[in-house]
From Swiss-Prot:
InterPro entries registered for this protein in UniProt: EF-Ts_dimer_sf, Transl_elong_EFTs/EF1B, Transl_elong_EFTs/EF1B_dimer, Transl_elong_Ts_CS, UBA-like_sf
Function, in words: Associates with the EF-Tu.GDP complex and induces the exchange of GDP to GTP. It remains bound to the aminoacyl-tRNA.EF-Tu.GTP complex up to the GTP hydrolysis stage on the ribosome.
Involved in Mg(2+) ion dislocation from EF-Tu: region residues: 81-84
Protein name: Elongation factor Ts
GO cellular component, one term: cytoplasm
Subcellular localization(s) per the UniProt record: Cytoplasm
Amino acid sequence: MEISAQMVKELRERTGAGMMDCKNALAEANGDFEKAIEILRKKGLAKAAKKAGRETKEGLIISYVHHNGKIGVLLELNCETDFVARTDDFKELGNKIAMHIAAMSPRWVTREEVPADVIEKEKEIYREQLKDSGKPAQVIEKIIEGKLESFYQDNCLLEQKFALDQNVTIKDMIQQAIAKIGENIQVSRFVRMQIGE
């Protein structure tokens, strides 16, 4: 199948990838846009992984206050250079993440930040729920691990599904931005406040 300039342009607009990357992905996918996007995402994630070790000393503090004035978020989003911190793409990513935090109430940025005593308490609760199930101990441990994964997905920002698109996690969104912008990006911390909490 012949890849037209219009097809390349459309794919670039949808993904933010480079022109030759788009053309090659379309050729590899025989003109199938969804396949081409998947190919680019896989390559983009590889690019993001290469940039993950770089230091992020620049960035922005992004604020979001819900329209009713009862929920507010402060988010520290870091990148490598001040130039990137001033771009619309970076600011838009920060705003999306801050709105997500307001809506979904994560407690930690990553699973590594969850205190050990909280994890033990959760495991204890799950064991108590399953003690009369009659299942073997190793099966119960597997179930507990599965429940713990769900706990992380509910409470850790990077593992949560994005509030406005359940097909991607916050981590996926950040990796897509890294692939598009070309710099490492990290959420350092956030504070979510709500009247009465």
